[in-house]
């Protein structure tokens, strides 16, 4: 990942990192708006997922997960930022005039050519069925159902491995370590998803975190008792239960019944 350097005039530019190769000006015919309801709230407005809310408005980019432009070569024109995922996307211009977005493969640069279909070269960014791939191939954007489009290994830095083929099925080792068997007629893209160092990227300031729709995380012991089961009153010792209920869950207290001792005198 190429890092763009700034003159350190403020703490945010001194500590933040920005990829200099990535643009953020999508094509109008490949984007559309989407409705965002209350972040982290249910239909009644109650918090169901903490530390979420706000964030910048997002436009959804139409990503080609099917890769159904068969045997038509395409060229990478731009590498762009997508606010809806942590991986980058790249704009492809195909030979028949079609323009589509795909996930950016690691190591792909502007000007590279890609193609999808059967018996295409085993090259980074090419999409082909698992039956045409040799064992040990690193792949991403893997189909589960034939023709539905890639559903596995799509996050930044994700990569799976083809470890076996037997009969009508192929065995994959997924990024989570799970070993899964799918139809070997399903297609996948060769290589690893780009933006591998996304977890090492420094945002530089709290405001950048809020743009992503992430709110501050506050410890329960510093809250008031009305706000959290672990909250305490000022001036009192912080003695709390060992395993308290989560925030917002009503405690069901059971009445303690004293056990009596029955003594029978004969």
From Swiss-Prot:
<dbReference type="GO" id="GO:0032543">
    <property type="term" value="P:mitochondrial translation"/>
</dbReference>
<feature type="compositionally biased region" description="Polar residues">
    <location>
        <begin position="7"/>
        <end position="24"/>
    </location>
</feature>
<feature type="region of interest" description="Disordered">
    <location>
        <begin position="1"/>
        <end position="24"/>
    </location>
</feature>
<keyword id="KW-0687">Ribonucleoprotein</keyword>
<comment type="similarity">
    <text>Belongs to the universal ribosomal protein uL2 family.</text>
</comment>
<comment type="subunit">
    <text>Part of the 50S ribosomal subunit.</text>
</comment>
<keyword id="KW-0934">Plastid</keyword>
<dbReference type="InterPro" id="IPR005880">
    <property type="entry name" value="Ribosomal_uL2_bac/org-type"/>
</dbReference>
<dbReference type="InterPro" id="IPR014722">
    <property type="entry name" value="Rib_uL2_dom2"/>
</dbReference>
<dbReference type="InterPro" id="IPR002171">
    <property type="entry name" value="Ribosomal_uL2"/>
</dbReference>
<dbReference type="InterPro" id="IPR022671">
    <property type="entry name" value="Ribosomal_uL2_CS"/>
</dbReference>
<keyword id="KW-0150">Chloroplast</keyword>
<protein>
    <recommendedName>
        <fullName>Large ribosomal subunit protein uL2c</fullName>
    </recommendedName>
</protein>
<dbReference type="Pfam" id="PF00181">
    <property type="entry name" value="Ribosomal_L2"/>
</dbReference>
<dbReference type="Pfam" id="PF03947">
    <property type="entry name" value="Ribosomal_L2_C"/>
</dbReference>
<dbReference type="InterPro" id="IPR022666">
    <property type="entry name" value="Ribosomal_uL2_RNA-bd_dom"/>
</dbReference>
<dbReference type="InterPro" id="IPR012340">
    <property type="entry name" value="NA-bd_OB-fold"/>
</dbReference>
<dbReference type="InterPro" id="IPR022669">
    <property type="entry name" value="Ribosomal_uL2_C"/>
</dbReference>
<dbReference type="GO" id="GO:0003723">
    <property type="term" value="F:RNA binding"/>
</dbReference>
<dbReference type="GO" id="GO:0003735">
    <property type="term" value="F:structural constituent of ribosome"/>
</dbReference>
<dbReference type="InterPro" id="IPR008991">
    <property type="entry name" value="Translation_prot_SH3-like_sf"/>
</dbReference>
<dbReference type="GO" id="GO:0009507">
    <property type="term" value="C:chloroplast"/>
</dbReference>
<dbReference type="GO" id="GO:0005762">
    <property type="term" value="C:mitochondrial large ribosomal subunit"/>
</dbReference>
<dbReference type="GO" id="GO:0016740">
    <property type="term" value="F:transferase activity"/>
</dbReference>
<dbReference type="InterPro" id="IPR014726">
    <property type="entry name" value="Ribosomal_uL2_dom3"/>
</dbReference>
<keyword id="KW-0689">Ribosomal protein</keyword>
């Amino acid at each position: 990942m190429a890092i763009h350097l700034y003159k350190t005039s403020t703490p945010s530019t001194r500590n933040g990192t920005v990829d200099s190769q990535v643009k953020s000006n999508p094509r109008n015919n490949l984007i559309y708006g989407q409705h965002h309801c209350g972040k982290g709230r249910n239909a009644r407005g109650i918090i169901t997922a903490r530390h979420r809310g706000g964030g910048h408005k997002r436009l959804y980019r139409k990503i080609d997960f099917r890769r159904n432009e068969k045997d038509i070569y395409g060229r990478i024109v731009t590498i762009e930022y997508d606010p809806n995922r942590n991986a980058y996307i790249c704009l492809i211009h195909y030979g028949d005039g079609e323009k589509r977005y795909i996930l950016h493969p690691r190591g792909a640069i502007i000007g590279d050519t890609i193609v999808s279909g059967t018996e295409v070269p085993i090259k980074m960014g090419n999409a082909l069925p698992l039956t045409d791939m040799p064992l040990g191939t690193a792949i991403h954007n893997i189909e589960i159902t034939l023709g539905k489009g890639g559903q596995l290994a799509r996050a930044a830095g994700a990569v799976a491995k083809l470890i076996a083929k037997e009969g009508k099925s192929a065995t994959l080792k997924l990024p989570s370590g799970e070993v899964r068997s799918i139809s070997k007629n399903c297609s996948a893209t060769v290589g690893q998803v780009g933006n591998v160092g996304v977890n090492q990227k420094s945002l530089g300031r709290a405001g950048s975190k809020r743009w992503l729709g992430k709110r501050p995380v506050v410890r329960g012991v510093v809250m008031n008792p009305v706000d959290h089961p672990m909250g305490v009153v000022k001036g009192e010792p912080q003695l709390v239960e060992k395993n308290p209920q989560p925030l917002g869950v009503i405690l069901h207290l059971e009445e303690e019944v004293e056990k009596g001792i029955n003594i029978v005198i004969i």
